[in-house]
Amino acid sequence: MTTIDVVTPDQVDTGELIELYDSVGWSVYSRDVGTLRRALAGSSTLVIARDSAVLIGLARVVSDNATICYLQDVLVKPSHQGHGVGRALVQAALEPYANVRFD
C-alpha cells in the first residue's frame, strides 16, 4: 500500500534518498550527500511516498509562504511510475500553498 506523508528531512534515511535519486538518473544530486541534505533542509515542505515502508517517491517545495511557491524535485521510482504516485506527491506538496502564486 502506498502512503504519502509530509516529513522533515531527518525522517528520511540518507541511503534511501541516494537510491531514489539514482533510480531516476539524478545522480548529480546524490554525489554530494551534504548538499542534498542542505537542499532538503532548506525546503519549505518535503513530501515522501512509501510502498510497504520502501521510499518510492519525493517532492519538495521552496516558498516564502506569502507570494511564491516553487515545486521542486518530483521523483518517483521507475517501478512505480504511471500509478498516480507523482500526482499524489504534487497534490500533497502544494496543498499548504493554496493562496500562494505558483511558478
What kind of region is each of these model predictions?
Residues 1-31:
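Short amphipathic alpha-helix that is part of the acyltransferase structural core
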Residues 90, 97-103:
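Conserved GNAT acetyl-CoA-binding A-motif
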